[in-house]
């Protein structure tokens, strides 16, 4: 399996990679980006649950501290441009003997920050493609009014408040996956 061998970033292994360097201004907007081929060596294998307690005590400017800072700045950038990211619960398969169970859990903040880094890289790549007049970009149009009306009805049926002054993007960001009635809004 490539993801566990030649294409993985296992600790102490040298692997070819595309390395992105993306500079941001103080509010998280991209000021420059470049990509280059390089050989990289991963120093350690991390997981979301393991780094979550470390982030709180991470030294300023460290990779983990920057993950939080940049993630939060990019979430604010997303909201400012009217973008939405659904607060989907994480799904995990639990195997006990011959029994398989699908379990759901609330996403950790670090998972959302990491997703913002991926989106940031995608935006940088898209800007390069637009500038170079190459590639195919996928964008989504605003939702149709009838789709928003259906969503209002669904929220009301689930007992989820949607104040009249709250915009569609703000509402989409508001469901709490920890509340039993809210996850169906993401489906």
State where each predicted segment sits.
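Electropositive polyanion-binding surfaces
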Residues: 1-187
């Amino acid at each position: 399996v490539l993801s566990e061998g030649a294409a993985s970033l296992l600790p102490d292994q040298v692997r070819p990679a595309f390395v992105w360097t993306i500079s941001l201004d103080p509010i998280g907007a991209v000021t420059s980006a470049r990509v280059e081929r390089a050989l990289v060596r991963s120093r350690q294998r991390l997981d979301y649950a393991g780094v979550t307690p470390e982030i709180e005590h991470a030294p300023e400017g460290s990779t983990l501290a920057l993950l939080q800072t940049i993630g939060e700045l990019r979430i604010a950038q997303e909201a400012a441009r009217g973008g939405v990211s659904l607060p989907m619960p994480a799904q995990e398969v639990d195997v006990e003997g011959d029994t398989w169970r699908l379990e759901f859990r609330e996403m950790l903040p670090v998972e959302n920050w990491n997703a913002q880094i991926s989106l940031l890289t995608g935006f940088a790549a898209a800007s390069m493609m637009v500038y170079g007049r190459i590639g195919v970009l996928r964008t989504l149009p605003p939702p149709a009014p009838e789709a928003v009306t259906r969503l209002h009805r669904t929220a009301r049926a689930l007992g989820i408040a949607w104040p009249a002054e709250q915009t569609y993007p703000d509402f989409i960001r508001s469901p709490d996956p920890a509340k039993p009635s809210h996850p169906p809004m993401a489906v």
